[in-house]
């Protein structure tokens, strides 16, 4: 017997609305089925940019392998950002960039910027360093060299290696190499619509 929406419990109405939203998303996806060859080219480009399983396996071997890979560094950076501790990897990256400085005239300016941002007492992104390392790094600011942050960088690397890196390995970072979803061909689109309609019918029948 057909019942009006007013007769349905609130939970059922919510479920029906949720399913309506999902169905709308599926319908939008079906519109993409008519894309031309240009869409196929985009999918090939996207596929080629995926990280290989071999590369990701190396990430689990060591933190060094992870952060010396562009995509690995980006993934680890995003993970640390989600934990509100991205200052550690940002400091490490800044030190790596600093060591590549070729102009002696720029050393002092770049060193001071890194120090003020990550090491000084009033640093906006202060990293966790022991007092001895912090004091030694502060002393190095008197005559900055390419190695003036080496000890501090090593300490932060070790901190990440023993702490956040281990948590990263337990995170769903392997999703980066999960198989791409099947293309939205005619059959796939039909199955998607059928699945949505079946789910919608189940919700209504349960609420009746």
UniProtKB/Swiss-Prot annotation:
Tissue distribution of the protein: Expressed in the developing nervous system.
Lipid-anchored residues (S-palmitoyl cysteine): 2, 12, 95
Keywords: Lipoprotein, Palmitate, Phosphoprotein, Signal transduction inhibitor
GO process terms (BP): negative regulation of signal transduction
Domain RGS as annotated: residue spans: 62-178
Keyword Phosphoprotein: yes
PTM note: Palmitoylated on Cys-2 and/or Cys-12. Phosphorylated by cyclic GMP-dependent protein kinase.
Entry-linked PANTHER family: REGULATOR OF G PROTEIN SIGNALING, REGULATOR OF G-PROTEIN SIGNALING 4
Role description: Inhibits signal transduction by increasing the GTPase activity of G protein alpha subunits thereby driving them into their inactive GDP-bound form. Activity on G(z)-alpha is inhibited by phosphorylation of the G-protein. Activity on G(z)-alpha and G(i)-alpha-1 is inhibited by palmitoylation of the G-protein.
Annotated protein name in UniProt: Regulator of G-protein signaling 4
Source species of the chain: Gallus gallus
């Amino acid at each position: 017997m057909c019942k009006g929406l007013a007769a349905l419990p609130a939970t059922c109405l919510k479920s029906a609305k949720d399913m309506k939203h999902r169905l709308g998303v599926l319908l939008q996806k079906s519109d993409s089925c008519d894309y031309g060859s240009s869409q196929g080219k985009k999918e090939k480009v996207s596929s080629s940019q995926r990280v290989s399983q071999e590369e990701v396996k190396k990430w689990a071997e060591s933190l060094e392998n992870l952060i010396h890979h562009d995509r690995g560094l980006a993934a680890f950076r995003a993970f640390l950002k989600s934990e509100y501790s991205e200052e550690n990897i940002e400091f490490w990256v800044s030190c790596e960039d600093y060591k590549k400085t070729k102009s002696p005239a720029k050393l002092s300016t770049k060193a001071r910027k890194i120090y003020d941002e990550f090491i000084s007492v009033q640093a906006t992104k202060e990293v966790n360093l022991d007092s001895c390392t912090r004091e030694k790094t502060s002393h190095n600011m008197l005559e900055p060299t390419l190695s003036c942050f080496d000890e501090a960088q090593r300490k932060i690397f070790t901190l990440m290696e023993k702490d956040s890196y281990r948590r990263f390995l337990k995170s769903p970072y392997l999703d980066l190499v999960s198989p791409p979803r099947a293309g939205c061909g005619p059959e796939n689109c039909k199955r998607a619509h059928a699945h949505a309609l079946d789910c919608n019918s189940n919700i209504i029948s349960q609420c009746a």
